[in-house]
Amino acid sequence: LYRLTPMEDAFSINAVALVNGKPQTLGLKAALQVFIEHRVEVVRRRSEFRKAKAESRLKLVDGLLKAIIDIDKVIKIIRGSDDAAVAKDSLIKSFKLTDEQATYILDMPLRRLTKMSKLELETEQKELKSVITKLKSLLASEESIKAQVSEELSQVAKEHGTPRRTKIS
């Protein structure tokens, strides 16, 4: 029956994958393990990148909050300075800003700087701190990274999966 009907078919696959930069022929189990390791690394690197971006933005928001408290003095320093370097040094000394924060404030148009709300900046600061905390806790343990990978793969299966067409009895 198997020989004369298409009840049993065999097909071959080319299961070559790059493992640590070298091509290897993998079985199904090894291919799945390599894929999971890859996804774990992707989640780790993405989380580290997002954490670095959030920390960078948090530093800028902290500097803006310092400047917003005495916005009139900031505008006076900027307008009273001969050039950008003098204004930057004055801002750094007056408000104890970092070089990056002072540059960001100087690059911002004055009308945008004056329209910034302290409340908005404080809410953004709180959000950034919570995001950084979540990302640090995610990066702290391998189990949480694997749980994130599992959640992402479940989401992909939910979005792109097709339901079973035959019934198992």
Language-model features: where?
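C-terminal interaction appendages of subunits in large macromolecular complexes
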Residues: Y2-S169
